[in-house]
Design a protein with these regions (language model features):
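Bacterial Sec-dependent N-terminal signal peptides
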Residues: 1-25
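Beta-strand/beta-sandwich contexts
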Residues: 20-50, 106-109
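Immunoglobulin-like IPT/TIG beta-sandwich domains and homologous Ig-like subdomains
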Residues: 36-97
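Carbohydrate-interacting/catalytic domains
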Residues: 97-100, 105-124, 175, 487-626
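Conserved, mostly hydrophobic/aromatic
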Residues: 128, 174, 184, 205, ...
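Substrate-binding/active-site clefts of carbohydrate-active enzymes
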Residues: 133-180, 184-329, 334, 353-363, ...
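Active-site clefts of carbohydrate-active enzymes
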Residues: 438-460
């Protein structure tokens, strides 16, 4: 009898354990009331949670639907929060007789969506890589359980230890330089072996990587940046996640990823058999706008994986795109970011991304998002901008990246401007295509970034760099700088990307000099910093540059001229695109000069005659204000 009682007790104990409801995580961890879109998706994770029923008695909250996915460990709960007030809601998860009560906070919004102002062409974005900029907290460099565990500054492709605290401590540096917004590469958790320092393989969409800091530190950085008049732009990736994301080991549904078949066979099949099922993107983006594109070409571009360590998310799955949309909203509300830069924008499903952009625009009409649209061809780039007249669909993406300008300015920098289309003729032709853009002032231009060679290559000649900066900061664009340009940082990608992502001097213990201060910079670094800072501060609040009309002249006698005009004020950027002395023939530009007789060169404070021709030294640039 005792054995029977003991056996029954063990059976009841096992049944109780099996019936227990486990809720390990809910994404998002909290939400906000008062949103225009009152629907909320909760992704609940816990062992065998799929079978649970969910209820709540919080005033006004309605459960619209419960979605049971393929994995037994996920449950999607869709709530309607219309008219709901802030507070702590109790969610009841019931499986048989077992009940798990989970508290869930519904917060009040700090601002109305209309009050969140994004970046515009009045801003200059400063792009940096947190791991390579400054180490403000060495204690978070090596964290057990994070891959890779150790930092190693001697290796260009490993983590070096920079973090959010390092950025926060140098906010005054950005103010001194004269930039107005900071875009840094992704800071969310990248718990992956290999080059996790760059941040483009997310393993947790709701957590700052602890080697960069915490969510609270991100908020502190943003608040202090705002107090100093600086905006923060967050880098996001919807196209793919990191291979170590929990979704990969326990996929919520069979269609959560694009072309996931090879994952199922890795344990049972040979490497050759697995490789035959793996589909990598072709990196050819033309099928996304080609009216004659074949289905296979489009599939290979959009559904193929970027690399094997970055699983391709299926945004056509409505639950996937809803998760991603909510994640972006959560960061806007939680941290207070002023903009988003979306990585690999055209590689994701176009209709899903348009839905995201429409949702963001409806919730935050003055917010801005820039998409990475990497093709050096203006018609392609223009097709991706909101309200494009040359595209088959509306992307609703306000800002695109001008990779054509990047390519042409790097081709032109050492060429002689002649009658064959070389040199500054390339820049002239780039802006000819502005007729294709619905809004040229909302196109982001740059001369270098973290994925390209440095403009200087392996040299340090400033003549071409100054010309490029003068053009970049005076044309009808949103300008973006890359960290270190102001101190002549150089490098190429010939060996590895790490050589164009070097540590900022003075940002790390043991650095041989500190480029954050005038006293720590070399004479050459100081000269470039001072020159660029002068130009950046002049640009701030300059309506001629941000609101003015633009006129350009076909290069003549090697000289390229761009003119801006607003309310009777004029700015002319004059570029000698040759390696010889030439003449700025003022009569050719009479339609802009009018009756003005002299101008001030913003770069030197020198007075320049507008009635007599001016000799221009080789590679000379002037910014004339009159």
């Amino acid at each position: 009898m005792k054995r029977i009682i003991l056996s029954l007790s063990l059976i009841l104990c096992v049944m109780t354990i099996r019936a227990a409801v486990k809720v390990d995580r809910i994404d998002p961890a909290n939400w906000f009331v008062g949103m225009k879109n009152t629907s909320l998706q909760l992704m609940v994770y816990g062992e065998n949670i799929r079978q649970a029923d969910v209820t709540t008695d919080y005033d006004g909250v309605k459960i619209d639907s419960i979605v049971r996915l393929d994995s037994p460990n996920y449950l999607l709960v869709y709530l309607n929060l219309e008219g709901v007030k802030p507070g702590e809601m109790t969610l009841n998860f019931k499986n048989g007789k077992a009940v798990k009560k989970v508290k869930y906070e519904l917060k009040a919004r700090e601002k109305r969506g209309e009050e969140r102002m994004g970046f515009t062409n009045a801003d200059v974005l400063y792009m940096l890589m947190p791991d390579r900029f400054a180490d403000g907290n060495p204690d978070n460099n090596d964290i057990k359980g994070m891959n890779p565990y150790k930092t190693d500054r001697s290796q260009p492709s490993l983590r070096h230890g920079g973090d959010l605290e390092g950025i926060r401590r140098h906010l005054d540096y950005f103010k001194e330089l004269g930039v107005t917004a900071l875009w840094f590469t992704p800071v969310l958790e990248n718990n992956s072996p290999g080059g996790s320092y760059h941040g483009y393989a997310t393993t947790d969409y709701y957590r700052v990587d602890p080697r960069f800091g915490t969510n609270d530190e991100y908020r502190r950085l943003t608040d202090e940046a705002h107090a100093k008049g600086l905006k923060i732009v967050m880098d996001m990736i919807f196209n793919h996640c990191g291979f170590e994301h929990p979704w990969i080991k326990d996929m919520p549904s069979k269609d959560w990823l694009n072309t996931p078949e090879w994952l199922y066979d890795r344990k049972d099949k040979t490497k050759a058999e697995v490789n035959r099922k793996y589909m990598q993107t072709t990196y050819k983006l033309t099928p996304t706008v080609d009216p004659y594109a074949s289905a296979i070409d489009l599939k290979e571009t959009v559904d193929g994986w970027f690399v094997p360590s970055m699983p391709d998310l299926n945004q056509r799955n409505p639950h996937v795109i809803r998760y991603l949309i909510q994640n972006s909203i959560w960061w806007i509300e939680t941290v207070g970011i002023d903009g988003i830069r979306m990585d690999t924008y055209p590689y994701a499903d176009a209709d899903a991304m348009a839905l995201w952009m429409k949702t963001i625009d409806e919730e935050y009409p003055n917010f801005n998002v820039v998409g990475e649209t990497w093709v050096s061809d203006p018609p392609y780039t223009a097709a991706w901008q909101k309200d494009s007249k040359i595209s088959q669909r509306n992307s609703y993406l306000k800002t695109v990246m001008d990779f054509s300008f990047h390519a042409k300015i790097n081709q032109a920098k050492y060429e002689n401007t002649d009658g064959s289309g070389n040199g500054m003729n390339r820049i002239y032709e780039n802006f000819v295509y502005d007729y294709l853009y619905p809004n040229p002032s909302s196109v982001m231009a740059f001369v270098e970034n973290h994925d390209t060679d440095r403009f200087l290559g392996n040299g340090r000649d400033t003549t071409a760099l100054k010309q490029a900066m003068a053009i970049l900061l005076t044309v009808k664009r949103i300008p973006q700088l890359y960290y270190g340009t102001e101190i002549l940082m150089n490098g190429t990608k010939e060996k590895t990307d790490g050589y164009v992502r070097k540590d900022f001097p003075g940002g790390f213990p043991g650095d041989d000099h500190n480029a954050f201060t005038a006293g720590g910079r070399t004479p050459e670094e100081n000269a470039m910093f001072t020159w660029l800072s002068r130009l950046l501060h002049w640009r701030q609040g300059n309506d001629v540059i941000t609101k003015g009309s633009q006129t350009q002249f076909i290069p003549y006698n090697g000289v390229y001229v761009i003119a801006r005009r607003y309310n009777g004020k004029n700015v002319m950027t004059v570029v000698n695109g040759t390696g010889r002395t030439t003449v700025f023939a003022v009569k050719r530009y009479a339609e802009v000069i009018g009756h003005n007789t002299e101008a001030k060169d913003v770069l030197t404070d020198r007075t320049v005659s507008l009635t007599d021709d001016t000799q221009l030294e080789p590679r000379k640039v002037m910014i004339l204000e009159f």
